[in-house]
Amino acid sequence: MSNKKLVLAYSGGLDTSVAIRWLKDKGWDVIAFTVDLGEKKDLDAIQARALKVGASAAYVADGRRPFLELFVWPSLQAGAVYEKEYPLATALGRPLIAAMMVEVARREGASAIAHGCTGKGNDQVRFDVTTAALAPELEVVAPVREWGMNRDDEIEYANKHGIEVPATTRSPYSTDENLSLIHI
């Protein structure tokens, strides 16, 4: 592969912060990309963390309007809820994030996109399939599926490499928030 540049869906959490360093060690030039879907996170701090960890660039994009108009409202109108109670909040955001990543990858001349999904859930499928449909020329790299680390291993890796993350062995998981989680 001649172009080793990729765009990483960056949340600022443990998986994707460790992924920046891991991908760099594998020879990738990492561009961190965060999409604001209405979460109550300090996006400037997330962008700064990506750069501190080693991303060559870090972008934050506002995806709130397309998320609401193209994903949330149509799904609510269709009654798309899980167990008759929960909107498919996280699931709805993944295709939009992937589509926006494809745009950034093309603009930046990247040959791949990457995400921090594990091999256990459906999020990986949403990223992988959306990318394959919109940009079959782009490789999809999934470090968490490849590296064989569990959460404690990731925390140890982060500590060893001086990566500051909002996770500890006592509280290793983060949660996902976006506009579809608000009460309407």
Tell where the protein language model's regions lie, with residue ranges:
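ATP-dependent adenylation/nucleotidyltransferase module used to activate substrates
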Residues: M1-P166
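Short linear loop/turn motifs
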Residues: A167-S180
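Conserved small/polar residues in nucleotide/adenosyl-binding loops
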Residues: I182-I184
